[in-house]
Amino acid sequence: MKVTYIYHSGFLVETDSCYYLFDYEKGNLPCMDVSKSIIVLSSHGHHDHYNPAIFSLLKSCGMQTVYAILSDDIEVPELTTVLQISPGNEYQLWMNQSLTTFESTDVGVAFLIEDQGELIYHAGDLNDWVWEEESDSYNEQMTKNYRKQIDLISKKLNGRKIDVAFVVLDPRQESNYDRGMCYFLEHVSAKEVYPMHCWGDSHIVDVFLNEHTEYTSKIKKE
């Protein structure tokens, strides 16, 4: 499995069966095998997680087979093969992969894909969005909602390890920036974890690793 960081929450994952392009906003794509299928996944319609121009970009790159998996808050583009998804469901994909969706604490879904025995997780905007300016009741409910979804992921895994996970680490949350990441790492087993949604502040990953040295071996920098 090969992982390429694109921009913000956008990643390209190559497996033996296909490419997965998660939450593309903008950025350059690497050279790809045009005979291989690519699945474009967008967790929700926020501008930093979905850009409809991706489909014309892939066409200009010569990609021959393009599929799309879009959250149900996104207007479906004029494509021949689109799967529109909602939270809390399971789907069988075109090349015998399976997809489980989890409910975001903001909008849309998080993705858990199984592809020939390998597991890929992309959080979208599923995070413990605690803010200092919000009320205690808001933040308490947010944490409750987030932990419920992470616990559902752990239950779904039933002791298995995620091979590659993409998890929010947002510096705008200030002292609460690591709440979501820490709970995920404590309750979900993953081999490699890529922080995302950092708004260009890659230094926040160094801050996290300095404060949580126990995760040095599994946290991957862009």
Where are these regions (language model features)?
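Binuclear metal-ion centers of metallo-dependent hydrolases, dominated by the metallo-beta-lactamase
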Residues: 1-8, 77-91, 177-222
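Core dinuclear metal-dependent hydrolase active-site scaffold
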Residues: 1-35, 81-161
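Structural motif
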Residues: 21-22, 41, 120-123, 166, ...
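Active-site metal-binding motif and surrounding structural segment of the metallo-beta-lactamase
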Residues: 26-73, 155-166
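Active-site environment of divalent metal-dependent phosphoester hydrolases
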Residues: 27-29, 46-50, 73-77, 90-92, ...
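Short amphipathic alpha-helical segments
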Residues: 33-34, 52-55, 80, 134-135, ...
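Glycine-rich, phosphate-binding/catalytic loops in enzymes
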Residues: 38-40, 56-60, 138-141, 182-185, ...
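A short, acidic, amphipathic alpha-helical segment used as a generic capping/interface helix at domain edges
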Residues: 149-157, 174-183
